[in-house]
Each structure stands twice: as C-alpha cells, then as structure tokens.
Design a protein with these regions (language model features):
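C-terminal, well-structured catalytic/ligand-binding subdomain of enzymes
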Residues: 3-95, 125, 130-276
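Intrinsically disordered, low-complexity linker/loop segments enriched in Gly/Pro
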Residues: 80-124
Length: 276
C-alpha cells in the first residue's frame, strides 16, 4: 500500500519510497527525460494500456509521489468548475518548479481532484511533495478544499491513512491503514535524524516493507542520485544518476556495470534480466 518520507537531517536531505502492489504482473518503468533545463526521473506503471507516473524527482530536487489513501468517513469528492486534475498539476509542477512554495502559485486557489485508485479499488490517492530546501507537505482532497499537512520535526511521512485527519495528534495515536508503518518509520527516523543518510533510509523502507512491496527507492537530491532495490531484496541495489541518465549495479552484484537509459527509459523486468 506504499510508504514514503522526506527527511532533512544535519548533513543530508533524503527522500524514500516503497511502491506496493498486489498485481505481480504490473509492468514498471524507470524514465529520465529532459524538459527545458531540467532532467526528470519518473517511476511509472502500466495502467489501462497507459503508463502512469507514480513518482518523480527533477534535477532541481523536487520530489512528488502519489500513493493509496484510505478515505475519511463521510468523504465526498469535490465537483466544481474550480477543480483541477491532480496528475495534470503534478506533471506541470515537476516540469516547472524547484521549490514546494511554487506549487501554490501553480495551483492558484483551485481544488485538486484525484482520480479513483487504479491499483486498490475502494481507496483514493494522496501525494507528498518535497524540495531540497527543507520544505515538504502532503496534499489530500477535502470536501471543496485542499487539505495540507506540513513537515514537522524536520521530516514527514505518508502511508495510507489521511494525514490531514490526525494533524493534532501525537504520532503514536494515529490509526487506520498504514498506521503501524507510519509509527515504525517515525520512531526510527526520530532516533536517527542526526545521522540520517542512504543506509538509514533503506532501513526505514525495509522495516515498512510488505509482501507486496515491488520497488524501494531512495533519493539524494543534493547529488541528483537515486538508489533502487526490487522486491524487498535490499542486498541488491542500483544507483541512478539523474544528470548523466545512467544506472549501474552497486551492492550485491559481481560486476559494477553502468548503462545509459535507452530512449530515456528502462523497464524494470529488463533491468533484472540484465544483471542476473
């Protein structure tokens, strides 16, 4: 059901995400494309014969990830002429901005509307947006309003319950889908915030992974690098350069091969076959 976070430690800014799906045949793709003066990395899945970007980070360090949301009781989707499609505005945001503060300018007082969840029927969607300057928030669809939950204590975590419904509660009092993963991640990050880096991020993803976790990615935006593990095999990792548009085997492999993103993309199944 997915877990994500942004951590602003003393030395590093780190983003992390687990992508979970019970569709074991879901086709996944990594992309790095250029737009104006930016390189943009996307993690995408094939939904209804079209690749949908679940996550992205640009070379200015802006991170966006959309994952499953368990609706609050009594929730009704917005329906007004002031609505704007979530995925449309996220696409514009990652192409045009580098700071979270710029998102509100693009949104321009409009109400964001998420489509139905394509992977988990009965669930909705919510999104984490973070930048390398220490600013991050979670945006959720309210009743004729956008619900924003901002960073606290130098980090922010998103699982599958509505963050906006628990803003006044202590972290260990949340409940709902993914609450156990949220509490687990919160405890570990709090205890390791002063030395939080790539290894600590993967430890969070390992502790919050599930049987249906298909992909785990850690981003270091100040270096424009990403690290990826597949299917909870955290002994094997690849390193991605968003600037160079390359991926190379790292931990757990006999060789340290580096390859270019062909036509800007690599299919996850091909990546596995390349390094068998």
């Amino acid at each position: 059901m997915c877990t994500s976070f942004a951590v602003y430690g003393q030395e590093k800014t780190i983003y992390g995400m687990n992508f979970d799906s019970d569709d074991i045949n879901l086709k996944l793709k990594l992309k790095i494309n250029s737009y104006n003066d930016k390189n943009i990395f996307n993690f995408s899945g094939l939904i209804d014969n079209k690749y949908l970007d679940f996550a992205g980070v640009n070379s200015d360090g802006l991170f966006i990830y959309t994952q499953a949301l368990e609706y609050s009781a009594g929730f009704k989707p917005s329906c007004s002429e002031n609505d704007v499609s979530a995925f449309d505005i996220f696409d514009e945001t990652i192409k045009e901005t580098k700071k979270v503060s710029e998102f509100s300018e693009i949104l321009n007082n409009r109400i964001i509307v998420f489509p139905s969840n394509p992977l988990f029927p009965g669930f909705g969607l919510h999104t984490i947006i973070a930048d390398k300057y220490g600013d991050a928030f979670i945006i959720e669809e309210g009743i004729d309003e956008n619900i924003i939950s901002k960073t606290m204590n130098d980090f922010i975590i998103m699982t599958n319950f509505p963050n906006g419904a628990f803003q006044e509660l202590n972290y260990d009092k949340v409940y709902g889908c993914g609450a156990d993963r949220y509490i687990c991640a919160h405890k570990y990050i709090s205890n390791n915030i002063n030395s939080f880096g790539i290894n600590e991020a993967f430890e969070v993803l390992k502790r919050t992974s599930q049987e249906i976790t298909m992909c785990s990615i850690v981003f270091e935006p100040l270096k424009n690098e990403a690290y990826i593990s597949l299917k909870t095999d955290f002994e094997k990792k690849w390193k991605i350069s968003i600037v160079e548009k390359t991926i190379q085997s790292l931990d757990g492999f006999l060789s340290n091969n580096k390859i270019q993103f062909t036509n800007g993309e690599i299919f996850v199944k091909d990546l596995i076959n390349l390094y068998k």
